[in-house]
């Protein structure tokens, strides 16, 4: 019997945007995931600056972004834990909770994966979940980033939807055409009074405008205030 496949997408989500959703969609399609859980970070160790929005708003924005996706949800486990948000601790927490029977697939971009050797708990963290690395055009993983034996030996093409597999955790490289957008870009546009309609979901844009997050102004969407 095939175990449930649970996709995990972590991040500061400051704010969450269509690029995050594109990455999770690509992973979900390639790995036939049964469910996707977004986990906003309280404080990412490798992030230079503090999040601009509070944990409340970042969680709310993530929840609004997936509101119309029945098999997606948002977990507050890292926000409740507070302090530094380490992937190793989060994955261990999932194993110790009700997700023990599921296969875990940790979704991340190729840029984040390139620095995985500096992660807390490396290389042991690789044994806690399958890693799904999203490669978008112009951002493929460099061959040098895969030279380490513990990475090279795990790399594998995505399994078929009906394939049941156990054993060592793998690293799946998924090529995807995700939209080129970043949270930094969105914050800069908001601070300049520019629209972000194509960069975030309508519900996310409305919440940002309502609470004046990231310097958003009242006329963010011009005269159309219905969204």
Identify the role of each PLM range.
Residues 1-227:
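Nucleotidyltransferase catalytic core that binds NTPs
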């Amino acid at each position: 019997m095939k175990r449930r496949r649970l996709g995990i997408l972590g991040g500061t989500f400051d704010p969450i945007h269509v690029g995050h959703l594109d990455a999770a969609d690509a992973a979900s399609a390639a790995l036939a995931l049964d469910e996707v859980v977004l986990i906003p970070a309280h404080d990412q160790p490798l992030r230079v600056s503090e999040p601009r929005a509070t944990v409340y708003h970042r969680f709310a924005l993530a929840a609004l972004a997936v509101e119309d996706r029945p098999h997606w949800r948002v977990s507050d486990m890292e926000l409740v834990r507070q302090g530094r948000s380490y992937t190793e601790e989060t994955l261990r927490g999932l194993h110790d909770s009700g997700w023990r029977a599921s296969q875990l697939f940790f979704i991340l971009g190729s840029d984040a994966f390139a620095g995985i050797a500096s992660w807390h708990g490396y290389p042991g963290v690789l044994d806690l979940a399958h890693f799904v690395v999203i490669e978008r055009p112009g951002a493929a993983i460099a061959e040098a980033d895969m030279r380490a034996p513990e990475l090279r030996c795990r790399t594998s093409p995505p399994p078929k939807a009906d394939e049941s597999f156990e054993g060592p955790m793998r690293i799946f490289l998924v090529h995807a055409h995700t939209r080129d957008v970043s949270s930094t870009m969105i914050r800069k546009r908001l601070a300049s009074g520019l629209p972000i309609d194509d960069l975030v979901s309508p519900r996310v844009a409305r919440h940002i405008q309502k609470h004046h997050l990231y310097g958003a102004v009242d006329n963010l969407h011009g005269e159309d205030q219905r969204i």
